[in-house]
């Protein structure tokens, strides 16, 4: 039996969520990885050396905007074949990768944003309602479904 190599999809929106993800570089740089994020000056300049798939940012109040993400996310999954997905949010970029992960039995790990001091983000709440565990950066937010990992 051959052992499957580990490949990580790093999924996040531009800005603070992207910065939080780059803070994990000591971890993910040890693995084959690629990005699914939004295109802007920050992401383009910092991902010159990495494989990146850029998708449009959707909005919960306009659910049809998620449709534009389906093809690029499918392409990324088909080409890259991730074994794990790590997301720092937000759901505006991570929802479609999460749904595909559920359909294909890919492990999805969400680290809720540090800026959410009380409670969880909308996407974090959605994941909890779907029966998923999330990782929180605040000790006060920890419980059986939200595991405290400390600030990243």
Which residues fall in each region the model found?
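N-terminal subdomain of nucleotide-sugar transferases
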Residues: 1-38, 42
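Residues at the starts of beta-strands that form the adenosine-phosphate
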Residues: 7, 32-35, 51, 107, ...
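Short hydrophobic segments within beta-strands
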Residues: 10-13, 36, 88, 111, ...
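Conserved nucleotide-sugar phosphate-binding/catalytic loop shared by glycosyltransferases and other
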Residues: 12, 32-66, 140-144, 149
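Short, well-ordered alpha-helical microsegments
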Residues: 17-20, 43, 93-96, 119-120
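An amphipathic, basic-hydrophobic alpha-helix
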Residues: 61-84, 103
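An aromatic- and histidine-rich active-site surface loop
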Residues: 84-104
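Active-site-proximal region of nucleotide-activated glycan assembly enzymes
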Residues: 106-152
């Amino acid at each position: 039996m051959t052992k499957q190599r580990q490949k990580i999809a790093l999924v996040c929106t531009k800005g603070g969520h992207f910065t939080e993800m780059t803070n994990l570089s000591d971890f993910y740089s040890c693995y084959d990885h690629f990005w699914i994020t939004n295109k802007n000056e920050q992401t383009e300049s910092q991902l010159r050396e990495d494989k990146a798939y850029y998708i449009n940012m959707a909005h919960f109040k306009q659910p049809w905007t998620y449709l534009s993400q389906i093809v690029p996310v499918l392409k990324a999954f088909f080409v890259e074949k991730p074994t794990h997905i790590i997301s720092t949010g937000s759901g505006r970029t991570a929802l479609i990768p999460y749904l595909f992960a559920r359909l294909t039995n890919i492990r999805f790990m969400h680290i809720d944003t540090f800026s959410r001091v009380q409670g969880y983000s909308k996407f974090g709440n959605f994941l909890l309602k779907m029966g998923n565990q999330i990782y929180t950066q605040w000790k006060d937010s920890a419980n059986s479904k939200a595991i405290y990992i400390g600030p990243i």
